[in-house]
Regions:
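N-terminal periplasmic "start-of-domain" segments of outer-membrane beta-barrel proteins
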Residues: 62, 66-96, 124, 132, ...
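Outer-membrane beta-barrel signature, preferentially recognizing the C-terminal barrel domain
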Residues: 275-299, 423, 429, 436-490, ...
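Short acidic/polar hinge/loop motifs at secondary-structure boundaries
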Residues: 142-171, 185-187
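Gram-negative outer-membrane beta-barrel transporters
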Residues: 392-396, 486-488, 509-591, 633, ...
Length: 750
């Protein structure tokens, strides 16, 4: 009688970082843990094999761990990132009373959102006491910062429903991210879906949004379009905004991973007092088009990546509505190339990037010998960066260092960064870092003149060295974090009041500005019960400068900021989310009691203010109904220049979502970006992998390349893992028996 051997289904029982472990047998870092086993292996499993594993049919372990979004596979593709701080997460704040990106970021202790109008129609992003020009803005890891002015940098054609997360990237040395970088990441709600949202409310507010996604095989597509308008909450504050955005990814079997995104935005808005507080009749119109293409490829121990991007921006500003005063036409082109090598001593990265900025304008740049259409001025400049970085993780420690040079019209500058981390206990991580950064003067800094302002062509780059310390702890449903920083800034650019120049603002560089800050945050989050989420945060900033001058922007930072968010669920399908925040801004502004008359003015200090927002929501199946109320207490406040912002504003809306498939998977890990964790995909799949998080520390650039098949050599060192899923409570669960449906293909969006 023949002795028939039955093929057994292997199963991982535990995880470790030993040299003989299964993933270590691959002789490479597992950058992303989707090691999908082919269907043939699953189908060949016999009943005997299933019976063999019957002793593990129960859930082996349930992990309740924090989730961190990943958008990069290489370690620092362009510049080293010391840490990644989450500012917004769509899943965690799905029920929060936020309608725009600005309202989503307003509660973060690291960010100061300064609006001039309602619903984020014109706003600036300030990071940790820096100015809006010192903030780099990234969309899915691509730099789309506007070279003319930071006012336009985050005017991106993306609505809040397409944004999966927003992260603050600390320690991005090089040209641009003087105070830090904000990375906005997009992802579909489901693998394949169609969604419509409509809302209306006070002040003639109306909003309509149509979005959807298609995932087929190795191809994924996300597309969205929206229209938002209002009659305004006071004279000349009406607005209209159109957005269109598309993102497509494709993973070729041999060519690598391709990521294409493109978008267009058109907005017009009344600008009552926006740029001169005494003038109520200003008006502005902007149009922005952007696109980028990114490629990623892994070959053995090497990882390669390249990207190219383009942003086009038109801006028309009327001092008096209907009479064009300034027109600007800006082009920003970028390209990037890098390579990583993973070896026994760590991961070494080498790369470079190039940026070209050009502007046609009616008053910015050098005068043209012959007008170019309606434009009489133009200016162009190019910058480049080269860098070398090495990172190493050893037991509970991680270290990284980088060195590079920046090539600008102002000469060659050397840049560096250092970082280290230590994980003394599960859930606890300590990190420290230092980095050097710089920012070039914008075209507005160099050339803008007006009846109240004088330009300065002698400006040079701003420079800073920043020191960071962070600590994070998480256990079960609780999380705590502490961050402190000190930024020593030199040659800071600001508009300075000069009586000796006819009582005008003059673009100048003060010699020193030191900024100190501390941020505390804590939260409690569960997936069920009455109380679902409570978060509390506090931020404090103080500065020290070596000159006693009247500056327009450097000294009106947010000194104190505290925020509380609470979310409760009741009556099965109802939820209520409330956010309460207190703001205390340093500095003063000039108040004009009579609109249109600059001769009467007085200096006022910024007053503390309190904001309370809420959302009541009902959801069943494909339908979600909600009522929003912002500034419920009808507080009178301003973010800058004495421009009053809206009082109580109520809106209501409906969202209909038809789709299938799970939401795109997320990477779950410990509270620190440098600590190791587990990959637990959403949905039921035969996969689970251990991640060495040092591979993506501070990425935020580039996409993770997904492994589509498990090579035979993998089985020489161990068997593949048991299936993973996420239960109804949102916990990662590791099972023992594979699903009969086989592996569902995850989305490539993050």
């Amino acid at each position: 009688m023949k002795n028939i051997r039955t093929k057994q289904t292997p199963c991982f029982r535990r995880w470790s970082r030993k040299g003989w472990a299964a993933f270590a047998s691959l002789h490479r870092h597992v950058t992303i843990g989707v090691l999908a086993v082919t269907m043939s292996i699953l189908l060949l499993a016999t009943q005997h094999a299933s019976a063999h594993d019957a002793d593990t049919a129960a859930v082996l372990k349930t992990l309740r761990i924090d989730e961190v979004g990943i958008s990069g596979s290489q370690s620092a593709p362009t510049r080293n990132v010391q840490s990644q701080t989450p500012l917004f997460d769509r899943k965690a704040q799905a029920a929060a009373p936020v309608q725009t990106l600005e309202s989503a970021l307003r509660l973060a202790p690291s960010v100061d959102i300064r609006e001039r109008g309602g619903k984020g129609m014109q706003a600036d992003i300030f990071i940790r006491g820096g100015s809006f020009d010192q903030t780099m803005v990234l969309l899915n890891g691509i730099d789309f910062t506007d070279a003319r002015t930071g006012h336009q940098s985050h005017s991106l054609p993306v609505d809040i429903d397409c944004i999966s997360a927003v992260d603050l990237l600390d320690g991005v040395p090089g040209v641009g991210a003087f105070a830090g970088a904000v990375n906005i990441r997009t992802a579909p709600l489901k693998l394949t879906y169609l969604r419509f949202e409509g809302a209306g409310g006070q002040h003639g507010y109306a909003y309509a949004n149509l979005s959807g996604a298609v995932t087929s095989g190795r191809f994924s597509l996300l597309a969205a379009g929206s229209y938002r308008r209002s009659d305004g909450y006071r004279h000349n504050t009406e607005f209209a905004n159109y957005n269109a955005f598309v993102r497509a990814t494709y993973e070729a079997p041999r060519a690598g991973f391709f990521d294409l995104q493109a978008g267009y935005q058109n907005r017009t808005f009344g600008s009552n007092g926006f740029y001169a507080a005494y003038n109520p009749d200003q008006w502005e119109a902007t149009s922005t088009a952007l696109a980028s293409l990114r490629w990623l490829k892994q070959a053995g121990r090497f990882s390669f990546g390249a990207s190219a991007s383009y942003r086009k921006n038109f801006d028309r500003y009327d001092w008096t509505r209907g009479t064009a005063m300034n027109r600007h036409n800006t082009d920003n082109v970028g390209a990037r190339l890098w390579a990583d090598y993973d070896w026994r001593a760590g991961t070494t990265s080498l790369g470079g990037d190039y940026a070209f900025n050009h502007i046609y304008s009616t008053n910015l740049g050098e005068a043209l010998s012959r007008p170019h259409g309606r434009y009489t001025h133009a200016k162009a400049r190019s910058t480049g960066n080269l860098w070398l970085r090495h990172a190493k993780q050893w037991r509970r420690f991680d270290l990284a260092a980088s060195a590079g040079i920046s090539l600008t019209p102002y000469g060659t500058s050397a840049l560096w960064s250092l970082s280290g981390g230590y994980t003394p206990a599960p859930g606890l991580h300590l990190g420290i870092g230092a980095f050097q950064s710089m920012r070039l003067p914008t075209f507005t800094d160099l050339y803008y003149t007006s009846p109240a302002q004088i330009n300065n062509l002698d400006l040079t780059p701003e420079r800073a060295v920043t020191y960071l310390f962070d600590a994070g702890y998480m256990k079960n449903s609780w999380r705590l974090s502490l961050q402190t920083y000190y930024r020593a800034g030199r040659d800071i650019i600001d508009w300075v009041w000069r009586e000796d120049m006819g009582d005008k603002w003059h673009s100048e560089q003060t010699s020193r500005l030191d900024t100190y800050g501390i941020e505390l945050s804590g939260g409690y989050t569960v997936a069920d019960g009455f109380l679902r989420r409570v978060t509390l945060s506090y931020g404090y900033i103080t500065t020290d400068r070596n000159s006693d001058i009247i500056a327009k922007g450097a000294m009106d930072y947010m000194r104190h900021k505290a925020a509380l968010a609470v979310e409760v669920h009741f009556l099965r399908r109802m939820s209520l989310a409330l956010t309460a925040s207190v703001y205390d801004r340093n500095g003063s502004y000039t108040h004009y009691p009579v609109p249109g008359d600059p001769s009467l003015s007085e200096v006022r200090d910024y007053e503390p203010y309190f904001l309370l927002d809420g959302r009541l929501q009902w959801e069943k199946g494909i339908c979600r109904l909600y009522v929003d109320a912002t500034n419920i207490t009808d507080s009178r406040y301003c973010d800058l220049g004495g421009i009053p912002l809206p009082g109580a504003w109520g809106t209501a809306g409906v969202a209909l979502t038809i789709g299938r498939g799970y939401a795109p998977f997320r990477l779950h890990s410990s509270p620190s970006p440098r600590a190791a964790g587990f990959f637990l995909p959403v949905g039921r799949q035969p996969c689970a992998a251990f991640l060495r998080a040092s591979r993506w520390t501070g990425s935020g650039f580039g996409e993770v390349i997904l492994a589509r098949s498990l090579r035979q050599r993998f089985f020489r060192g161990g068997a593949f893992s048991s299936p993973c899923r996420v239960d109804s409570r949102g916990n990662g669960v590791q099972d023992s028996a594979p699903s009969s449906r086989g592996a569902s293909r995850p989305s490539r969006f993050f």
